[in-house]
Swiss-Prot record:
UniProt EC number: 3.1.3.-
Protein family: Belongs to the protein-tyrosine phosphatase family. Non-receptor class dual specificity subfamily.
Name by which UniProt lists this protein: RNA/RNP complex-1-interacting phosphatase
Entry keyword annotation includes Hydrolase: yes
Function statement: Possesses RNA 5'-triphosphatase and diphosphatase activities, but displays a poor protein-tyrosine phosphatase activity. In addition, has phosphatase activity with ATP, ADP and O-methylfluorescein phosphate (in vitro). Binds to RNA. May participate in nuclear mRNA metabolism.
Domain of life: Eukaryota
Domain Tyrosine-protein phosphatase, first and last residues per copy: 60-207
Assembly description: Monomer. May interact with SFRS7 and SFRS9/SRP30C.
Biased composition (Basic residues): 1-11, 233-245
Organism expressing this protein natively: Mus musculus (Mouse)
Gene: Dusp11
Polar residues bias locations: 251-262
Predominant location category: nucleus
């Protein structure tokens, strides 16, 4: 008799068990290593930045100890304990399962920039981040509200883009920017490719690049305008290099591309009133895109406008990419 018959019945039961497919994680599973990081860092002196890990909505709390919970409400409480006020959240995660925009107070601006983990953010992602920060600072120069940035752990993607901004725009030395971020976050940037890129990459002046860069922005609306949309999930595999969401403008736009024609209706100028319309294509496949307050696109040759008075933009960008 085959030795496997006696213990496992007919067939090689032990071998079959070894080949069984891994159990799929549910949508409510806690991000890997999420518990290992401090929820919120400290404000970075001389800047408006504060970094934190992604807050998790209530449905995740069943899998956490009470002291491990970190919800959007906990985020604001912890920042208030530092006698600071949050004005903008830049979400760099490549999913929307962790919390909903409705979990945030209406007074908080929110921008989603889909950013793939582990790899160096591309120029489009960096450009979107810089634009979002500069626009917020311009509109909030008379207050001291903070820009909160998070990825999953609030460390690698978050640290890279904050440091990239400080190096390229503020002129900070790479090592100083990295040290400042690490000390304020309470954890050090872990990914060596991020650190090496920050240390070695030359700062580039964006002179004479108005055509490829401003074409993507001159018809776009305020990146911090509060907008709800009605996106529904689409079960399609995302493009390999897809980055960022799409900004819903405050005027009527017609936008068509070869892959995804859509239109955007005119939004109310009253930020407390939201209208629903057809919406841009979603981000990563299999996620819920029904709750989104801001959409951002800084890609060239994407927006075309009808009956829209374009805002002023300089002929070339003086700040760095």
């Amino acid at each position: 008799m085959n030795q496997h018959y006696g213990r496992h019945g007919r067939g090689r039961g032990r071998d079959f068990a070894a080949c069984a497919p891994p159990k799929k994680k549910g949508r409510n599973h806690i991000p890997e290593r999420w518990k290992d990081y401090l929820p919120v860092g400290q404000r970075m002196p001389g800047t408006r930045f504060i970094a934190f890990k992604v807050p998790l909505q209530k449905k995740f709390e069943a899998k956490l100890m009470p002291e491990e919970c970190f919800s959007p409400l906990d985020l604001f409480n912890k920042i208030q304990e530092q006698n600071e006020e949050l004005g903008l959240i830049i979400d760099l995660t490549y999913t929307q399962r962790y919390y909903k925009v409705e979990d945030l107070p209406e007074t908080i601006s929110y921008i989603k920039i889909f950013t793939v983990g582990h790899q160096i953010p591309d120029n489009d992602t960096i450009f979107q981040f810089k634009c979002a920060v500069k626009e917020f600072l311009k509109k909030n120069k008379n207050n001291d509200k903070l820009i909160g940035v998070h990825c999953t752990h609030g460390l690698n993607r978050t640290g890279y883009l904050i440091c990239r901004y400080l190096i390229d725009v503020e002129g900070m030395r790479p090592d100083d920017a990295i040290e400042l971020f690490n000390s304020c976050r309470g954890h050090c940037i872990e990914r060596q490719n991020y650190i090496e890129n920050l240390q070695k990459r030359h700062v580039r002046k964006n002179r004479n690049v108005s055509a490829p860069r401003t074409d993507g922005l001159e018809d776009s609306a305020d990146p911090t305008e509060q907008v709800y949309t009605n996106n529904k999930p689409v079960k399609k595999k995302p493009r390999k290099n897809r980055r960022g969401g799409h900004l819903a403008p405050s005027q009527h736009f017609q936008h068509q591309t070869q892959s995804s024609p859509y239109s955007l209706r005119k939004w109310s100028q009253n930020q407390s009133v939201y209208q629903r319309g057809l919406v841009p294509p979603p981000g990563p496949a299999g996620e819920d895109y029904s709750q989104r307050r801001f959409f951002w696109s800084a890609r060239p040759n994407k927006w075309t406008a009808e009956s829209y008075q374009r805002p002023f933009y300089p002929y070339y960008w003086e700040w760095n990419l």
